[in-house]
């Protein structure tokens, strides 16, 4: 495997222009965020925030400020409502498992949308080992949750409902407030959790206005460092801790806090919301230019998900018929354009995206899907370069597919 990777990297030598559009699975951290983080590794606030000495007190002060700043961006009431975790996946594990264990005397039913992210879906499935049942709520062809089916699914045994604010693959902006109201009217004791990683920094999102009990977000999806996320827990809601160990500044996540990454995440959140409207407008304009250019140059394409304001401004998911998404990803990589074929979580299993299957895409359409996400740091020149190399890459892959008789 290592040798194969070395050979693949050699093929990329000589690339002069690179455009990173795989912002679903990672992101390039801007220099201003890196610069903000660096001193906290070895020059200041490098102590354990629970210890009684200067470096510890410095770390405590910094982390408390970060709690406050991130809580404000989410619309949380208190800084104590926020728990920093080593990523979105860990935050979802804490939210779902912690809520289920705390709610087990109320009920043992979990209701989720059928297009939840893999890290939500798998945790919910895992809870079946502890006696919980799971019911999936269907979506329509654009990925919107069927609210009538949601109402039918929630009953007196429902402990937790999980619906992402924005779908990570097709960008569907769910009517979250309406969904929360339906759940609470049917069962006031049921908790409502939302993975807001693809809403955070892209659409207006306020936990208090929405009425959610739990929300999770990711650092790298707002151009912060990987390995950092956060969970919001509404004041007055009980959650069981799922990991044991030394308790620092957070009662729900043990261990020594990672001050540099917390600082980086906080700086990323500040920048994402500092010029929110302008950032969103730029992401949308670049995305629209990219999509319009692709559809102008190529035929046999399928747009996956909704359009307009009902979709996340950065998200573009296209099924390219007579082409295989993974092959196109490699072909574009050789030209310095980096995208994702569907969901990275599904790709390693060589299975079509469960999201695309749920919205009615055929097997070939799902396997021919690609996912691209723009950021506020991209330029018009970046999109121009992508549009320059994209059609020839697709035509080359289609030629290979056609010659092999694969469809």
Predicted regions and their residues:
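Pyridoxal 5′-phosphate
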Residues: 1-407
């Amino acid at each position: 495997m290592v040798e194969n990777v070395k050979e693949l990297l050699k093929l990329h030598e000589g690339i002069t222009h690179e455009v990173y559009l795989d912002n679903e699975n990672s992101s390039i951290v801007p220099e201003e965020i890196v610069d903000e983080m660096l001193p906290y590794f070895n020059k200041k606030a490098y102590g354990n925030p629970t210890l009684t000495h200067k470096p510890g007190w410095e770390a405590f002060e910094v982390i408390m400020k970060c709690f406050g700043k991130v809580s404000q961006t989410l619309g949380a009431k208190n800084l104590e409502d926020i728990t920093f975790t080593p990523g979105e996946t860990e935050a979802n594990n804490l939210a779902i498992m912690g809520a289920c264990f705390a709610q087990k005397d109320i009920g043992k039913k979990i209701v989720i949308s059928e297009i939840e992210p893999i890290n939500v879906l798998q945790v919910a499935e895992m809870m079946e080992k502890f006696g919980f049942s799971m019911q999936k709520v269907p979506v329509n062809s654009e990925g919107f949750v069927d609210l009538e089916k949601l109402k039918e699914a929630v009953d007196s045994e429902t402990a937790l409902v999980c619906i992402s604010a924005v779908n990570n693959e097709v960008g569907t902006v769910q009517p979250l407030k309406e969904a929360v109201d339906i759940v609470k009217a049917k069962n006031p004791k049921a908790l409502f959790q939302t993975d807001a990683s693809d809403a955070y920094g892209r659409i207006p999102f306020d936990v208090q206005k929405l009425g959610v009990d739990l929300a999770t977000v990711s650092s790298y999806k707002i151009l912060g460092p990987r390995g950092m996320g956060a969970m919001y827990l509404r004041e007055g809601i009980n959650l069981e801790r799922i990991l044991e160990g030394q308790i620092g500044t957070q009662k729900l996540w043990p261990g020594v806090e990672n001050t540099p990454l917390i600082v980086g995440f906080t700086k990323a959140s500040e920048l994402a919301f500092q010029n929110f409207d302008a950032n969103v407008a730029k992401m949308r304009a670049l995305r629209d230019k990219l999509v319009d250019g692709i559809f102008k140059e190529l035929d046999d394409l399928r747009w996956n998900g909704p359009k307009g304001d009902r979709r996340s401004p950065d998200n573009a998911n296209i099924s390219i018929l007579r082409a295989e998404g993974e092959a196109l990803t490699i072909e574009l990589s050789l030209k310095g354009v980096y995208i994702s074929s569907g969901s990275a979580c599904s790709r390693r299993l060589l299975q079509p995206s469960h999201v695309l299957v749920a919205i009615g895409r055929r097997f070939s359409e799902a396997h021919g899907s690609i996912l691209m996400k723009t950021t506020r740091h991209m330029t018009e020149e970046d999109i121009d370069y992508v549009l320059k190399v994209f059609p020839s890459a697709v035509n080359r892959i289609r030629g290979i597919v056609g010659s092999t008789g694969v469809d």
